[in-house]
Amino acid sequence: MKEIKILEDYTTKTPLQLIGEMAGVCWGAKLDKDKNIARAIDCIKSGHGRVEELPDVYLVIEGFSAKALRELYTHIGGLPTRLQASTRYIDYEKGFDVVTPPSVENNNDAAEVWYKAISDIKMAMGALKALGIPKEDYTNLLPLAYQSKMIWKVNLRTLVNFMNLRTCFRAYWEIREFSNMLKKALMEYSPEWEIICKELFVPKCDAVGYCTEAKCCGRHKTKSEVIGEDAKQD
């Protein structure tokens, strides 16, 4: 079962108050809750991304495929920390769960091929173990579909970039599912996170007003189309 757990003891509960208070120090402004929140929103809307590096989120991610979790390693802004379940110490030869894509699940012939391949891998791992091959070697057979677990510590600025890219309709379906689940979890975590999620955790095309992808899904016009229209108006 896919699950995203926010570690409340470590995750910033009031990110807007934190941003506003720190920004207020820079400006020598009066510090209070309402002014801090207003100042934070103003900073974010003005594009001062540096202040978004202050709030941190700590997560336990479980039930997603190793393939999907690999995508998190490509988001390196703000030096995020990732700790993933070890393939050297967990007894995967006793069996492992996999994430099956809907395209396979909804195709009986494809599903038969898929599950046979997974079964063959499990049998091969058991056979290699019996032959004395160490766990750190026979677990190299694990497929990218196997379900893994991860701790992810990430700041708001990196999360905004992540959400802009991974809530896009062209993102891989499972990482898009993860993004939407995380957005929902943070919206329920605190009122300030709800504001942030609604305003910032959107596809990039919604944020900038046009599509930057080479293959556009049609949700927004492409950048060249928008620039062309602006040029005609000028």
Please place each PLM-identified region on the residue numbering.
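Family-specific signature for flavin-dependent thymidylate synthase
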Residues: 1-234
